[in-house]
Amino acid sequence: MVTARLPRPWGARRRPTALAVALSAAALVLTGCGSGASGESSEETISIVGFAVPEAANKAIAAEFAKTAAGEDVGFTTSYGASGDQSRAVAAGLDADYVHLSVGSDVDRLVEAGLVARTWDDGPHKGIVSTSVVVLGVRDGNPKDVQGWDDLVQPGVEVVTANPASSGAARWNALAAWGHVTENGGTEAEAADFLGKLFDNVVSLTNSGRDATTSFLGGTGDVLLAYENEAILAAQNGQGFEYVVPETTVLIENPGAILEDATPAAADWLDFVLGTEGQRQFALKGFRPLNAAQPGVVDFASLGLDPADIEGAQDPGDPFPVVPKLLTLERDFGGPGWDGVKDKLFGDGQDGAPKGIVTLAIEQSGKATQ
């Protein structure tokens, strides 16, 4: 069972800046129900700071964690928002024991700030706790007949996506569009031209992936660039939309890490997230569970699930279809981290460095201030 209560006060670990204090005002709290005496609380509290998309999955995992010996006396405070904004807020002092962010570079910022150990990604899954794929959300009946990436740059097709300047989800979207060209025989110049045409068609450039979904559900645009799990979760919430899994797309790999001065229970939490029950809950909320041997391929039997258990999937018999060309950071873009593409695509031009290809495409489209 999960109940709500007020967030715990700021700890003495880091002095929060005004930015961190403002963000903390929006924090939600989940608490595992225990059997302690009425009015008394001996709970240890884990502060989770994450990007917006996995909030429902983390809530479900917390409910299962509360049933274990390690989690029965553990409560949670949570804060969710755009990945880059959340990472910067933690660096500025927002209280956190565990971060669940969209891209590894947002964790790297915390490593450089001395808040997360440099060994955070040394485990068998290299710091990744959840995965999904980039899909193309469309209107009922797919009136624009969107079958893949090339349809998004046609005249009259209106696209909704988050802004890569604030959103990690948007960076995965842009990387998938880039890879559609470069990993199918195109040159980087052709890929840059494709991105320019794509952002010319963007009609809503939101702060986070969740905001992009909300915008699309509100009637904006013809196509939504989204995580597959966002489409599945929307259907679970009675707001489903059709989506296309492109023949070429990217495996989204979301990192999780505990902070250097985290409460001891945070390590138990991370172990649970990476374990069978944690990954099972991710699957039930539309994420593709971790699979080191075959990334992006779901082994239902190992999780005690049947395909039909994934409510809201477009095809109940095949909720996580095999992608013909599933690109990964490590194999296709100079990974395992973002170093091979971060500055090339998303450089902000500070300190005299050149602006990235995606940054320029957005500026040239006139959408940078949306």
Give the location of each predicted region.
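N-terminal segment of the mature folded domain
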Residues: 39-166, 304, 362, 366-367
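Extracellular/periplasmic juxtamembrane helices and adjacent flexible linkers that interface
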Residues: 3-5, 263-370
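Bacterial signal peptide processing site
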Residues: 34-37
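Periplasmic-binding protein-like
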Residues: 128-136, 195-198, 205-206, 236-267, ...
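Ligand-binding cleft/hinge of the Venus flytrap
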Residues: 63-68, 150-210
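C-terminal motif of bacterial Sec signal peptides marking the signal peptidase cleavage site
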Residues: 27-32
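Ligand-binding pocket segment of bilobal, Venus flytrap-like solute-binding proteins
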Residues: 184-249, 255
